[in-house]
UniProtKB/Swiss-Prot annotation:
It comes from the Bacteria. This is Tyrosine--tRNA ligase. Its EC number is 6.1.1.1. The lineage of its organism: Bacteria, Pseudomonadati, Pseudomonadota, Gammaproteobacteria, Pseudomonadales. Residues 336-396 form the S4 RNA-binding domain. It comes from Pseudomonas putida (strain ATCC 47054 / DSM 6125 / CFBP 8728 / NCIMB 11950 / KT2440).
Length: 399
């Protein structure tokens, strides 16, 4: 096991906050594996790179010799996390949650070591609680304290409804830490209130309080808003290798260091060397290629990553693209779906043709076939091909 100082440095890499650091240091000094918990509500069937920020941190804890608990919130998923929400989320059925949970397990083991991962479902203990147990749990916190949360406070002051079951969510998440006897809990910055609840409940139930590591919310491909499938600025971990590669090599230069810190397993020394190389004149795209290859290999294997790189770098092969590829600039105020970009760039006659080509798999971006969900990020440049004869190197510029 690494020294306490070395462990702490890796734990703090990319982290927003460690609470309470001095307590965590004392736990590390004991030289015993700690129980590290991170919970995920399976509210959707697929994960994107934003979700993997926490999973990557779990892997780092595994590599340090600690016991990782991947908690699937099949019980809390039916409540719906109110964190950051302006309205009550519709609850999912048990069947929906379990179906999504199964795909989560398949996806996370692309990062985590299955032999060193304890998979838990919070319904295991929550389904056993009696009404009296729930009343005892609810008695640990007051409504006034709940309303200290920004999201609840905003809804309360604007007369937006807050359902009673939403107050239960932080309590249930906190009780998960009691049930699992967690030493450390990981979560996004938007989860801090819930994570602190775990500390308080553990004390109430006679346990040593867990420490908290909060991780930032990963920016999407636009470099501004958090990564979200609904915003179209995401990289899905089950996307085709070529699409994943194409998206990653096209991120803004300013975003690549953030992605290296939160998504890459390269050492900080190696990343700092990349920074120095760029400062000394290296092409940022060459560095982004290293990032893209690493991430594609993680989810699809080394061969798929090599093939994606080869396809993107071999556009002139067999006359696929003309040597005098036209440079096209499209003005926009925000990210655009690929169909709109093709239309504005003049690579298709109209929106209907763009849709037809996308539906038939006849649109390529940087050598990879894309579908209608591909979002062209503001500031990005891609080589686009629509059909067999329409090509262009398209840049989406801010208007």
């Amino acid at each position: 096991m690494k020294s306490v100082e070395e462990q702490l440095a890796l734990i703090k890499r990319g982290a927003e906050e460690v609470l309470v650091e001095s307590e965590l240091v004392e736990k590390l000094k004991r030289g015993q594996p700690l129980r590290i918990k991170a919970g995920f509500d399976p509210t959707a069937p697929d994960l994107h790179l934003g979700h993997t920020v926490l999973i990557n941190k779990l892997r780092q804890f595994q590599d340090l010799g600690h016991q990782v608990i991947f908690l699937i919130g099949d019980f809390t998923g039916m409540i719906g996390d109110p964190s950051g929400k302006s309205a009550t989320r519709p609850p999912l059925t048990r069947e929906q949650v379990l179906e999504n949970a199964e795909t989560y397990k398949q996806q996370v083991f692309k990062i985590l070591d299955p032999a060193k991962t304890e998979v838990a479902f919070n319904s295991t203990w929550m389904d056993k609680l009696t009404p009296a147990d729930f009343i005892r749990l609810a008695s640990q916190y007051t409504v006034a304290r709940m309303l200290e949360r920004d999201d609840f406070d905003k809804r309360y002051t604007t007369n937006q409804p807050i359902a009673i079951h939403e107050f239960l969510y932080p309590l249930v998440q906190g009780y998960d830490s009691v049930a699992l006897k967690a030493d450390v809990e990981l979560g996004g910055t938007d989860q801090k209130f819930n994570l602190l609840m775990g500390r308080e409940l553990q004390r109430s139930y006679g346990q040593e309080a867990q420490n908290i590591v909060t991780m930032p919310l990963l920016e999407g491909l636009d470099g501004v808003k958090k990564m979200s499938k609904s915003l179209g600025n995401y990289v899905g971990i089950q996307e085709a290798p070529g699409v994943m590669y194409s998206k990653l090599v096209s991120i803004p230069d300013t975003l690549m260091w953030r992605y290296f810190e939160l998504l890459s397993f390269r050492s900080m020394e190696e990343i700092e060397q990349f920074r120095a190389d760029v400062a000394n004149g290296a092409n940022p795209r060459d560095i982004k290629i290293k990032l893209a290859e690493e991430i594609v290999a993680r989810f699809h294997g080394e061969e798929a990553a090599a093939n994606a790189h080869r396809a993107a770098g071999n556009r002139m092969k067999e006359g696929e693209l003309p040597e005098d590829l036209p440079e096209i600039e499209v003005a926009a105020a925000e990210d655009l779906p690929i169909a709109a970009v093709l239309n504005r760039a003049g690579l298709v006659k109209n929106s209907a043709q763009a849709r037809d080509l996308l539906n038939s798999g006849a649109v390529k971006v940087d050598g990879a076939v894309v579908d209608k969900d591909f979002m062209f990020v503001l500031g990005a440049t891609h080589v686009c091909q629509a059909g067999k004869k329409s090509f262009g190197r398209v840049t989406l510029k801010a208007e």
